[in-house]
Amino acid sequence: MYYDSRPLMSDSADEKPRDSSSEMLWGFWYPALPGKRVRGRKLERAMLLEVPLVIGRNAAGKPFALRDVCPHRAFPLSFGRFDGASVECAYHGWQFDAHTGQCRHIPSLTADSKLKCERIYAGSFPCEERDGYIWAFMTNPEGRADAAAEIPPAPELPTLSPSYKIARLAADLPCSVDTGIIGLMDPAHGPFVHQAWWWRSRRSIRDKAKQFEPIPNGFRMSPHAPSANSAPYKLLKLITGEPATTMIDFVLPNQRFEQIRAGKYWLSSRTTVTPVKRDLCRLDFVAAWNILPWFPVVSFIIHVLGPRFIRQDTEVIERQGLGLKYEDRMMLVDDADRQARWYFELKAALAESRRTQEAMRHPVSGPVTLRWRS
């Protein structure tokens, strides 16, 4: 049985529901850029969900994110000056509070002007720093504040001990966010895209059975023994002397968490596929671990082999884009593609929940076992 990737809540490939690929998910945190890029009073440009942002730090080092458009003449605020508290537009000198976006000063106003500059706002977005990234909470395209909205804390990578190593990788993906995410969660491409003696090959393909369960805004591959046909997992057992388990979560809008545990040792990672524009995403990967920190095997795998994996995935997406120009309907085949289908159904359920103001109806009703070969 197969499914069209565009049906969201339907089991029929013959139906033709709306395409969700162009829909941006608002009301979530997204990583905007690495925190180390924003230093002193320097202003940095970023783009999330086709919204231009200007990002900086106040005098205390707290990050802020404004819509990079002056409400006066649409001049980019990122060309302006920042004094540690206010951003000044380089066109007419209008000044805006760095965190609220409220206009503080308009140099051209005379003393008897009736214009209340404090009623003018540049778009602003809640901003926090976690795991070496500056995150922006994308409320809406205009950056309008909603006093009634409850903003959750920014995502944070789970760590299981006070002392650990951490590493980060990034890459641009020339695709829509949906294409990037269903590629991220695809379990069957490894033996073909990531062939290597130290990873997998066509000869290593075998039957897999994994149990999944619902979690808020996502689903979990329940803790299980890692793939026996992957050399890094064999090496992990050799190093630690402990049997390993791995658990994988996907959480809307764009996060994949993986946690590997072997006795007292652990590795925790998060991968996000963030829409920059409708046809461009950014992949951000961060991992933390306490596995023999004095022995650089994990660091080597992440810094040397990790970029190779990402390049292979990027190349596949680039080539897939050549075909998507002519055919944007993709088949989703049970059970290997069920996670992709859940992703589309989660997006639809979230949209319906927001429309009706009712609790979201989760597409994964309970524990279920999926089977495929990889």
Q: Where do the model's predicted regions map?
A:
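Rieske [2Fe-2S] iron-sulfur-binding domain
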Residues: 1-2, 6-13, 17-21, 31-159, ...
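Short, mixed-charge, low-aromatic patches
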Residues: 2-4, 21-25, 130-137, 226-227, ...
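A generic structural signal for short, non-catalytic loop/turn and secondary-structure boundary residues
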Residues: 23-25, 48, 120, 129, ...
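Non-catalytic accessory segments flanking enzyme active sites
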Residues: 25-26, 192
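Sequence-level motif detector for i,i+2 pairs with an aromatic at +2
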Residues: 27-29, 41, 122, 131, ...
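Enriched - but not universal
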Residues: 29-32, 97, 200-201, 345
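C-terminal catalytic domain of Rieske-type non-heme iron oxygenases
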Residues: 62, 143-374
